[in-house]
């Protein structure tokens, strides 16, 4: 794993009035800054039935890793998270149904993102009324998808880069289109010629395959437990909504549809509603 920081601690669990059992909790992250993914690992001397981590107003599910004594969770620090001290509340139950609770501190530091200035078709900066209605409808549809946290975990093992090209635009960049400030870049752009195969970074289920106003031909893959991959600006689809896909399966082709200045792949990751950098995910669970 490519983490740059790791925090470990012990807390006491006292189920059902029995003697306390030690639980080791470790947190790993490339950094504790906006857009980063934090890996939470729990080792218990007593088997647990369920566990979740609540922080930043979101509830992140944890899952047993190999057995009920080892649990893992992924926490997202959203792009707009302010610097400060936050508490991760761990809660769940053991196999006897007794509650398990604890908390741990995360200290989030500030991050400065660069700015990109682009000249694009005016219809993407000031959409006509008909397009505005379409944009609103599409935004609502995508929000409903990202709000769902499925109980099934499709993904397993390390994540893979979906295309071989280098990064050409980083996550979090502040965007200025035709001289007007717009929302920050919530994904990572990879260079690629039109027609380059786009592969699923991990297993999942296709929950959207449609043409959207801004991101053009778009695919969303539900990897489970609130994690989604969003691929934009494709030239073609190789899957349909409802399809279950395997890691490295071709799901589409690089294109230049929607709001673009040239062909590339836009890859966004959502984790229980938080906007995180795909490269942060790869640093923890990448290959």
PLM feature spans:
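Surface-exposed, glycine-biased beta-strand/turn segments
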Residues: 26-27, 100-215
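Non-catalytic surface loops within mature trypsin-like serine protease
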Residues: 44-46, 77-79, 108-112, 173, ...
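A short, sequence-level motif marking secondary-structure junctions
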Residues: 65-68, 107-111, 234-237, 281-284
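Cationic-aromatic interfacial patches
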Residues: 19-105, 110
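Bacterial N-terminal signal peptides
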Residues: 2-14
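Short, charged/polar, Gly/Pro-enriched secondary-structure boundary elements
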Residues: 82, 112-115, 276
